[in-house]
Amino acid sequence: MKVLDEFDITDRTKLRLQVGEYRDQERIDIRQYIKVDNEFIPTKKGVNFSSEWLDKFFLMVEKLKDI
């Protein structure tokens, strides 16, 4: 997976945006990472989906502006 961006939630937690391939399909991964022994490791808190769904994902996120 290639890291596109990330930001710190706390000094021990970060949110990371990655892109990569799985079974010949481009995937997007947005996941929370926690620091364990000076290394950030992925948690189950996140979402992984096909890049084919990216336009629909943006439409969903756009609705957050209305709240």
Regions found by a protein language model. Give the residues of each.
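Positively charged, low-complexity terminal tracts
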Residues: M1-I67
